[in-house]
């Protein structure tokens, strides 16, 4: 008996301990974090997100290499077969998952926004909070991704979730008779939720992001918390088509879409599928995936009404289809938009939508699951907007008369939607990449000449140093060029030398007057040097600008007593003004750049927070950011040559003086009574003014974590480490956009 009883008691004890443990874990209060006690403390977390340690594939994994081993046609064949393999646990509308997967791909890519380049399909962020649990717009997309798991499981590390979701959207379109423009792979998956400012609201679908004039705050891309773009029922649920059109134009514009692309996307996308609002969500639908019980295994929005799916499905609360054949590419969306007069009605869930006034339309649309049931077509307020707005009306009527133009416009707009955050074409992978270069891809001419060798590089560097340009001028210019890069959507950077073109040449942070002088001298050096080269070898101005900064850093290090070589890899090319969309590049202009101690009135955050934002855009770590700020101050690289933070008596020399003097207790700091936002460092004994600084400078002595790093570089043995680390971080920024190396 004892032999049998002990395991039974052990099992019972285990079950009880698990049950009690679960209850105790729920009851235990969460520890109070530092952010509660010191809410104003500068948050460095953005510089630590998606660390390589979080990647289960490890540091040696190269996604591009893995992707290029795929048989892409075989992958697409598998995805296509999945389209019509309806699963009992989530049956396909009309027997085809195509429209469902289009919505998944669209809503994965559609959170992209131009002002900070965040959002988009790269990273596969739809898997993580908050996107995986956004109400209305992303309801049920957890099922779409779960349907794709067999495909992801089969191809594993060769196919990221980011690429799979977009590719599935493409295959869905093609399986329903639409010819897509192409597909480029290369979206590397993230392993945690990206830190994005989605808004300050504390309730879903709340709206506190408009000012008194009704203008949407930057960098927001959606009108309400938890939406992709606009409320389909109208602004804040008010069914006003013209007001809806205004919001559509703004939000789609913030995703880099013009009016024609916007119309093509809405009309093309709503050609397929249906909306789901069979019941009142408040009465039927359970918690979202993030809030659902552990037993739901990442699925949410459990529907307790009827079957819980099929004809009882609830997502947005709107109900119905836009065409009579929602799994085929047709012109019915536009045809019916103008054929019928549309009147307001409500879905079974009580949401405002529109149906034809003509009762003869009542049976045009088949039910998605019940063969003996038919319905009238529907439109959202955001659909009626395409007819009510004069500009959208001109485009929709033109598309209606010219189906081939509409089809091409949708194909190109869909391609742009799903690839906008992937960066330049050089990053695209796979056999389906279209040959055409598109202006929104920020094209750069292909390399068409032999590159200069090491001997040439040394000779060119000497020519630059002999040009009369100073170390600070060369460093400022190289930094201004390369630091325009942002890793959120892979735009900007030194390649292309767009710093000499509109609009970058006139950005205030770049000190246009000095920049023009420096570029003129560098262009002369380039011209003379290319004229001296034998054969067809050439060097671009983009390379000359970067090399100029690099040899300046070498010279500054040598004057500090350290001989070091700054790596340089030629191969950049020069873009033309024709290849540069001025309006598109305008959003890259920095409102602040703490590395240059530049801060404008257009900044949306404090100076220190804007520094973190800029460092995050450059994919820098905390130590990299710290060493770059200290080094650039020593090099006298501030915008417009301002002296704040230049804590050295030998500016232009790459010393660790910034850290030594910042940490010097003989200096007492006080707010300046002469200039707002500036601090004065006085000798603690005599009161004599020694230095001036901005909050960006002083944060490295005030913030406990940043001070800890600063102490490393300010120590007596810190000079060599400082120079070595500065050169590594400098080289990282200079090559941030070199996707070819």
Swiss-Prot record:
Pfam families given for it?
Answer: peroxidase
**Catalytic residues in the record:** 107
**Organism's domain of life?**
Bacteria
- A cellular component annotation (GO) from this entry: cytosol
Question: Which residues does this entry assign to the site Transition state stabilizer?
Answer: 103
What this protein catalyses is:
H2O2 + AH2 = A + 2 H2O; 2 H2O2 = O2 + 2 H2O
How is this protein named in the record? Catalase-peroxidase 2
Q: Which organism is it from?
A: Shewanella oneidensis (strain ATCC 700550 / JCM 31522 / CIP 106686 / LMG 19005 / NCIMB 14063 / MR-1)
Q: What is the lineage of its organism?
A: Bacteria, Pseudomonadati, Pseudomonadota, Gammaproteobacteria, Alteromonadales
Q: Which gene encodes it?
A: katG2
